[in-house]
Amino acid sequence: MLDNTRLRIAIQKSGRLSDDSRELLARCGIKINLHTQRLIAMAENMPIDILRVRDDDIPGLVMDGVVDLGIIGENVLEEELLNRRAQGEDPRYLTLRRLDFGGCRLSLATPVDEAWDGPAALDGKRIATSYPHLLKRYLDQKGVSFKSCLLNGSVEVAPRAGLADAICDLVSTGATLEANGLREVEVIYRSKACLIQRDGEMAQSKQQLIDKLLTRIQGVIQARESKYIMMHAPSERLEEVIALLPGAERPTILPLAGEQQRVAMHMVSSETLFWETMEKLKALGASSILVLPIEKMME
């Protein structure tokens, strides 16, 4: 029996989002042993329970108020939302924030030897998918009628097996499509992981914990997107150096012992620092350029 005074968070037990979700919670300072086969794990240092479940169960657990928070792919969330609306329900939840992992796209794919002149080419065709509602919404908007072939796995083999004329499936690199004689022809939905919260009243202690967790998640994401940069630079070219680092805050400038014309610069940059940028910094006279990852960050 779950303790209702503890914050309940549902994450994917295994699969595409599992490792990233676990890493995010760990970097937020939640100490928990997720290396066992237990479906419910209790945090050691916070009143938090982690439920490890199938990804397509997470939206329902949040919408039905069984858990307080869930980390889920937007594609799975949107499919469940459309499914419930199709059954006459009015599902409610709050999206707290989009996360920086789990990126994918839901795409239409057809056999490589078939011509493609847009979605109209699928009119009257049979399409295999695990996302029938997202597919229907997209093709309805295009005025295309089709027959759906619902598969919960190995969707890419459907055309070769004679089950469908085309597929609608998640794509990352496209290698699986190519291996099955298919090509990606149209992206119908782009997705990332997101953090969602159940609708309705929340105990003050839980809401305070959620607010703390959101602040930490923001810090983790900012840290991953930022770099700490240190270098020595000519005093007379500081503004040129700073101009090469868009997104950087104004730097900390420190004197160098025994140097009158050069200073030490420290700054946080939210931009990716490419080799080309470092070469331009060097051309301006910068030296000892260090680019370091940031573990935690709070504004």
Swiss-Prot record:
It catalyses: 1-(5-phospho-beta-D-ribosyl)-ATP + diphosphate = 5-phospho-alpha-D-ribose 1-diphosphate + ATP. GO terms for molecular function: ATP binding; ATP phosphoribosyltransferase activity; magnesium ion binding. Its EC number is 2.4.2.17. Its main location: cytoplasm. SUPFAM superfamilies: GlnB-like, Periplasmic binding protein-like II. Pathway: Amino-acid biosynthesis; L-histidine biosynthesis; L-histidine from 5-phospho-alpha-D-ribose 1-diphosphate: step 1/9. CDD domains: PBP2_HisGL2. It is found in: Cytoplasm. One of its GO terms (cellular component) is cytoplasm. This is ATP phosphoribosyltransferase. It comes from Salmonella paratyphi A (strain AKU_12601).
